């Protein structure tokens, strides 16, 4: 009941962040070492998606809000990543946006995850395809490749973010279209001024990070 007074926008931010704390573990090199971890992660994501839709329409729905709170605890305690390594590149992208523009954390993640996913999809299209089938219940079309199904899964995730009124571009985030200088500054900050790469699933250097920021710059 303590959640009932939350602004609708902050509920949406919470839904996205809970999803991201699991997705940033779900997509990692080699994947978790056992099926159980995947099953827990996929079940949590489906639950948050369903409860999120309800909560965004009725923030006083006790059942929906309790599901979100419970999922938040499980998503943040590393249960959904046991046996694997954390990627968390999208969180790094988001932190720099929040630092430069005072944007809400969850909102930066809904902008950056679809762009990151499209940029790295060829690292493991089968993993993204499985995500689409297991979480979004997508059915593979006749002759559809892993990559095509993977892109459909990414699009479906982005559509969900829009459906709960979360931003998916810089303009929707409220910061407008950025200059090339601003994009380069974001990439520099994200790499600690060219001293590190970001992520484990597909490690990204300055050029890769800049490319992902450019994809969101609309």
Where is each model-derived feature located?
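A glycine/threonine-rich phosphate-anchoring loop and its flanking beta-alpha core
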Residues: 1-33, 130
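Glycine- and other small-residue-rich loops at beta-strand/loop junctions that grip anionic moieties
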Residues: 8, 37, 201
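Active-site segments that bind and position negatively charged phosphate/pyrophosphate groups
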Residues: 25-156
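C-terminal charged capping/lid subdomain of soluble metabolic enzymes
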Residues: 139-218
């Amino acid at each position: 009941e303590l959640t009932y007074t939350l602004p609708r926008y902050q509920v949406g931010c919470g839904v996205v962040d809970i999803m991201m704390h699991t997705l940033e573990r779900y997509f990692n090199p080699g994947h978790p070492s056992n099926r159980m971890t995947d099953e827990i992660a996929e079940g949590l994501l489906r639950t948050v998606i369903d409860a999120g839709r309800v909560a965004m329409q009725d923030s006083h729905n006790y059942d929906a809000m309790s599901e979100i709170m419970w999922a938040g605890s499980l998503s943040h305690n590393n249960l959904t990543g046991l046996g694997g390594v954390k990627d968390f590149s999208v969180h790094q992208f988001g932190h720099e946006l929040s630092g430069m523009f005072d944007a809400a954390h969850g909102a930066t993640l809904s902008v950056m995850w679809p762009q990151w996913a499209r940029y790295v999809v060829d690292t493991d299209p089968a993993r993204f395809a499985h995500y689409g089938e297991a979480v979004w219940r997508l059915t593979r079309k006749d002759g559809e490749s892993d990559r095509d199904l993977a892109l459909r899964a990414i699009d479906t995730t982005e559509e969900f973010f829009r459906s709960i009124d979360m931003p998916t571009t810089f303009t929707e985030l409220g910061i407008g279209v950025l200059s090339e200088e601003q994009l380069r500054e974001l990439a520099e900050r994200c790499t600690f001024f060219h001293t590190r790469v970001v992520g484990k699933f597909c490690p990204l250097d300055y050029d890769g990070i800049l490319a992902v920021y450019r994809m969101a710059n609309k």
